Regions:
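Conserved GNAT-fold acetyl-CoA-binding loop/helix
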Residues: 34-54
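Soluble sensory domains of the PAS superfamily and closely related sensory modules
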Residues: 56-58
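Acyl-donor (CoA/ACP) binding surface of acyl/acetyltransferases
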Residues: 1-33, 37, 62, 66-177
């Protein structure tokens, strides 16, 4: 399995590499507190978004999701290579486009492409409180494999103690490998 960018087109979307012109669209959703609520980072400033965009342009793991009809970049899907022919998938979308099926459409296209390229397993981790995320994974055919209790923290409280969070782990297997 090569570590290459997954690029695809669906009926409504173009899944592609990031480009410099994405800065405003990227800032629009990475600066939104509700969008990044379950992410390991806080809402970003414009300068932080510029640095994030530089990294995204240079990596094969972040895929920009663009609307075909308007060419607006509305979110991203993460496909990171892991051990044993496995990929980790994640997604973040502009709140103005939630509930439109874009996350499902883009993930489905990338999962199909990954499996046709020999990927054996795709997994995702999410916060149990993020019901929309784990419902999406279940709709995509992922199965919940684990509920890890207080296994990770991103932030600390005022006394500098970790704020521990639970994690659900979901996976989907390629039946042809």
């Amino acid at each position: 399995m090569e570590n290459k960018i997954f690029i695809a087109e669906t009926e409504r979307l173009i899944l592609r590499r990031y480009k410099k012109e994405d800065i405003q669209d990227l800032f629009e959703y990475l600066s939104d507190k509700e969008v990044v609520r379950y992410e390991p980072y806080k809402p970003q400033t414009f300068d932080e978004t510029e640095k994030s965009l530089e990294w995204r342009i240079g990596t094969d793991e972040m895929i920009a999701v663009e609307l075909k009809n308007s060419h607006k970049m509305i979110g991203n899907v993460y496909m990171g290579k892991r051990d044993f022919e496995a990929l980790e998938i994640g997604y973040v979308f502009n709140r103005n486009y939630w509930g439109c099926g874009y996350a499902a459409e883009s993930c489905k296209a990338l999962i199909e492409q990954a499996f046709s390229n020999g990927v054996h397993r795709i997994y995702a981790e999410c916060d149990p409180n993020n019901k929309s995320s784990w419902k999406l994974l279940e709709a995509l055919g992922f199965q919940r494999e684990a509920h890890f209790r207080k296994n990770v923290y991103f932030w600390k409280d005022e006394a500098e103690r970790p704020i521990w969070k639970d994690t659900y782990v979901y996976a989907k297997l390629n039946d042809n490998t």
